[in-house]
Each structure stands twice: as C-alpha cells, then as structure tokens.
Design a protein with these regions (language model features):
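Conserved acidic donor-binding loop of glycosyltransferase catalytic domains
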Residues: 104-105, 123
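Terminal amphipathic alpha-helical/low-complexity segments used for targeting or macromolecular assembly
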Residues: 118-214
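Short beta-to-alpha loop/turn elements within the nucleotide-binding domains of ABC transporters
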Residues: 79, 100-101, 107, 116
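Flexible, glycine/small-residue-enriched loop-and-beta-strand segment within the central core
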Residues: 3-81, 89-94, 117, 123-125
Length: 214
C-alpha cells in the first residue's frame, strides 16, 4: 500500500486478506465507506453444487496512484485500475448474481445475472465452461504473484483451490483438500473426482511448469 492512501471507514471496508500477495494499492488512494476489494471469489460453490468440480479462482487487483473509490464500490479479482481514476459509488436456484447488481425482476434457473438493473449475461453451463478454460491460468497467476512477493514457492495451503490440477483419486488427500471436496456437495464431487485426470504429477511438477522471473 502506497503512501497517502486512506481508508476512511475501516469497519465498513472489506479488503481481502486471504491472498495479500495478489493485491497492490498505489499512492494517494482514497477508499470510502463500504468498499469491497477481492482477490478471489466463491461463486464456484454454485458450480460445485451442480457439476461437482472444485474450480477455484484467483486474480490480481492492481490500483494505481491518485484514485478515488466511491461509497459501496466492489472491485473484483483480476482487475487493474490505472492512475488518476474516479470509481463511482455503488459501482434463484443455481443462479450467480454479480457483485453490486440491482435485481428488480424474476429470473430463470441456471443462469448468471449481473448489472444495474440486472440481466442474464450467460447460462450456468456457459459460465462453467469458461471457468474450466481459465482455471489453470489463474493458478499460474497465483504462483507468479506469490513468488514475486515472498521469493519462494507457494505450498499446499496457498494452492488449496487448485489442487485438482495435480491431485486425483489415487492420491492421499491432506485434510484441507478433503474439506474442499466436502464443501456444498459430497456425492457429486466424489464421482467427479474419481473421473478427474490430473494434468501434473504432483504439486512440485506443477510449480516446475511455471517459469520464474516472468
């Protein structure tokens, strides 16, 4: 966090502390009442409830210098805000509702809705396929940011939302990974995990695949 940055109402402000190495806040950033800044999301719980997969999420949040963030704004992961920016205030079954959405009518099942006013932006199946397609890249981003911050490799805990990349039903799961598989739904996940074909032999194989210094 750069100099001259102020959080005016810390009690109402939520800044994601789970992965601090994914967040950079510049100088003279003014963070007002009710602001939320996230470096991960738990919307994958809906996908897990329907499909069974653990498809974690992670992404950088970079806020430049001389930025004003208005009341009630929500900044999601994988977001970069440049310098000299003003962020305006206030920025169903198996439904994912995007941050800061205004829902003022009924919506069908199995959709993702967002906006003010809210509208359907895609089906749950489309969102599921999208998450699968970028899941590994988000894990790689996490590794690179962790290395940059701490100059060492992330471990089992840091990669707990991405362990399906390097773990399958033939491996003995650590308690944290067992817990992840038991969230939301167990039976669907157990069946899906039996079918999971890990891309990497183990966590070290995955980490070796990510070049240092990029």
């Amino acid at each position: 966090v750069g100099g001259g940055t102020h959080i005016y109402d810390p009690q109402s402000t939520l800044i994601d502390a789970q992965r601090p190495y994914l967040m950079t806040i510049g100088e003279n950033v003014q963070i007002t009442h009710g602001v939320t800044i996230l470096t991960h999301g738990y919307d994958w719980s809906v996908l897990k409830g329907v499909y069974g997969d653990v498809i974690g999420s992670a992404g950088e949040v970079v806020i430049g210098n001389n930025v004003f963030i208005g009341t009630g704004s929500i900044i999601l992961y994988d977001t970069k805000i440049g310098s000299n920016v003003i962020v305006a205030a206030g920025s169903i079954n198996n439904v994912i509702i995007g941050a800061n959405s205004l829902v003022n009518k009924s919506f069908p099942d199995n959709v993702v809705i967002a906006g003010n006013p809210a509208k359907v932006i895609c089906t749950l199946e489309e969102y599921y396929k999208k998450r699968l397609s970028i899941y590994e890249q988000e894990a790689i981003c996490l590794v690179k940011c962790y290395r940059k911050k701490y100059n060492k490799e992330p471990g089992y805990n840091e990669l707990h939302e991405f362990f399906w990349l390097f773990t399958d039903s033939n491996d003995e799961l650590i308690p944290l990974y067992k817990h992840m598989n038991e969230l939301v739904t167990i039976d669907k996940t157990n069946e899906k995990f039996k079918q999971n074909k890990k891309k990497y032999k183990d966590i070290n194989d995955f980490l070796k695949s990510v070049p240092w210094g990029e």
